[in-house]
Amino acid sequence: MNKSMLIFFTILFLTYIIEEKEALKVEDLPEPESYKRAKQLALKDAKGDKNAETIALNFLKQNRRDCMKNCKLVPTCALLSPECCPDKTDVCKKLAL
């Protein structure tokens, strides 16, 4: 019985790893134009400070990822992740993916 349980959980674990590897992630999606503009503004506001640039870009990436799950998280979710907002606003429909 222990051997069969070990085999079962090994197969279950391998299935999980394969599905996780094959799953489409936010980083795999093309960046919409509005997100590219937000990145440019963040870099412009950092004024050449590499630490500030890194923080700003990480903040944008995290907000984009979180907006995929909850479109009402921040008011700019429609701009950061227009392809995943559950209720399609006019702004979201006009944005390019």
Swiss-Prot record:
Post-translational events: Contains 3 disulfide bonds.
Tissue expression: Expressed by the venom gland.
GO MF: toxin activity
Signal peptide span: 1-23
Coiled coil: none
Keywords: Disulfide bond, Secreted, Signal, Toxin
Gene Ontology annotations for the cellular component aspect, listed alphabetically: extracellular region
Subcellular location: Secreted
Family to which this protein belongs: Belongs to the scoloptoxin-10 family.
Protein's name according to its UniProt entry: U-scoloptoxin(10)-Sa2a
Organism: Scolopendra alternans (Florida Keys giant centipede)
